[in-house]
Amino acid sequence: MVPSKANEDFLIANAHAKINLHLEVLGIRSDGFHELAMVMQSINLSDQLKMIKRVDNTINLKSNNKEISNGDDNLIIKAAKLLRNKVENQELGVDIELEKNIPIGAGLAGGSTDAAATLLGLNKLWKLNLKIDELENLSKEIGSDIPFCISGGRQICFGRGEILEKLKFDQIQLGLVLVKDPSIQVSTPVAYKKYKEQFGESYLEDDRDFEIKRNSIRSIDWSDQSLFDNRKEIQNDLQKSIRPMTPEVEKSLNLLSSLPDSRLVSMSGSGPSCFALFQNYDQANKVLKEHVNEFERAGLSAWACSMMSNGVELRNEFT
């Protein structure tokens, strides 16, 4: 799919996965969705989307993963059509080739980050000149995690995850070992349903109470590296429901907790992916290499990752 030379009708987007450094379920909103308080972080485990501009109204998608639909139910297709409808130019089209590296159904926002990359990439490829906040607002129509994935980095996320408060600091030094059992996926709606069944009686019911909890999250210095040694400050509420009912998550968390020098160990999102934080990427990579046989025996896919300050990277150069 790569043209003979770089040109303005071709673009590559690297779409970064995310982890949840914090996830609290506060209660039920008036629209029936859960009210959440989260801290999300982009990591360098990435999908790659190659895009070639068309001018014949055609939007094509192909992928290296046969599990990926190339129809209208795919978030990439939804994002492309949403953007085209927004600018009211039905002649716009694109060929997209997806290299899928982020595991599916893993709590890593793999589909959402692909949609974010599509919006950012086509905004540039189609020369639409929409601002980031316009793309974030537009993306809320098709997914709660997509607004975060557009700008990425480390952000506090409220509402369904679409209300963003970006955190700014000089360096994101932490590394992580990320694991997932490739034999399972966890349905996000099922995870929230299960949590509501078990803990719904403790839900907050008033927006004033929601705001008190939001302010509590805001008051934490999320750039403080030592914060991630204090397990009382960090939580993933969904882990309380998913861990007991999912042996693969239990296995993952136990193995990660046994690694030397690991700091916070947690499930990401609704799972089943889990991670252990380390002082930096080099330490995480060293530990992964030293324990790779243990992960293989446990049937876990494993990655050493660094944290990213953005959600998507665009370029039109190629090798």
Curated annotation (Swiss-Prot):
Matching entries from SUPFAM superfamilies are given as: GHMP Kinase, C-terminal domain, Ribosomal protein S5 domain 2-like
Q: Does the keyword Cell membrane apply?
A: no
Disulfide bridge partners, by residue number: none
**Which residue ranges does UniProt annotate as crossing the membrane?**
none
Arranged from A to Z, the UniProt key words for this protein are: ATP-binding, Isoprene biosynthesis, Kinase, Nucleotide-binding, Transferase
Q: In which pathway does it act?
A: Isoprenoid biosynthesis; isopentenyl diphosphate biosynthesis via DXP pathway; isopentenyl diphosphate from 1-deoxy-D-xylulose 5-phosphate: step 3/6
Instruction: Identify the catalytic residues.
Output: K18, D145
Q: What does this protein do?
A: Catalyzes the phosphorylation of the position 2 hydroxy group of 4-diphosphocytidyl-2C-methyl-D-erythritol.
Q: Which family does it belong to?
A: Belongs to the GHMP kinase family. IspE subfamily.
Its recorded name reads 4-diphosphocytidyl-2-C-methyl-D-erythritol kinase
Organism name:
Prochlorococcus marinus (strain NATL2A)
Gene coding for it: ispE
